[in-house]
């Protein structure tokens, strides 16, 4: 195992959030993030940039090209606030609830859900796809109280 970020689902999710978070003008950890994603991984916002419905489907390079200008110019910290995880054999599906903030502790920008599909190849975990959507009028995060 050469990538400590890929040893567990927890380490993958933590590294994913850490890699895109930072202050305006701070370089993001794109290569760290790339190393979490399978070479054929897809990243899919469930809403268009205009806010309307419809998926934009990106490979990793397309995702970086679409997000880097905003992240380079803005303080942006994405923090996991809850999770639902389902595993079967070498596959896992994680619903990761997040807050995006302008500072690590404040300045709430938005909240949403990342639907992350992962696979263990016998040596490490890979992100195969991530689809996400944000809260908006008429759509709120579900209750995050842990279920028994």
Model-derived regions: residue spans:
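Short, low-complexity N-terminal intrinsically disordered segments enriched in polar/charged residues
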Residues: 1-36, 146-148
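Hydrophobic pocket/interface hotspot
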Residues: 16, 33, 41, 94, ...
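Short beta-strand segments enriched in hydrophobic/aromatic residues
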Residues: 20, 37, 98-100, 131-133
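Surface-exposed, charged secondary-structure patches
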Residues: 42-43, 47-105
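A short, polar/proline- and glycine-enriched secondary-structure boundary/capping micro-motif
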Residues: 54-57, 105-108, 136-144
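Short, surface-exposed coil-to-beta transition loops
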Residues: 78-81, 109-115
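Short beta-strand edge/turn micro-motifs at domain boundaries
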Residues: 111-139
């Amino acid at each position: 195992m050469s990538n400590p970020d890929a040893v567990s689902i927890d380490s993958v999710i933590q590294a994913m959030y850490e890699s895109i978070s930072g202050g305006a003008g701070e370089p993001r950890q794109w290569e760290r993030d790339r190393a979490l994603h399978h070479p054929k991984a897809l990243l899919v916002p469930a809403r268009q940039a205009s806010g309307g419905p419809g998926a934009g489907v990106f490979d990793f390079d397309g995702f970086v090209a679409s997000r880097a200008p905003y992240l380079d110019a803005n303080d942006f910290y994405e923090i996991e606030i809850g999770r639902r995880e389902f595993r079967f054999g070498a596959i896992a599906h994680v619903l990761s609830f997040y807050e995006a903030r302008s500072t690590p502790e404040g300045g709430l920008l938005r909240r949403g859900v990342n639907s992350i599909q992962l696979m263990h190849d016998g040596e490490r975990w890979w992100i195969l796809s991530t689809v996400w959507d944000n809260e908006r009028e008429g759509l709120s995060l579900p209750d995050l109280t842990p279920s028994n």
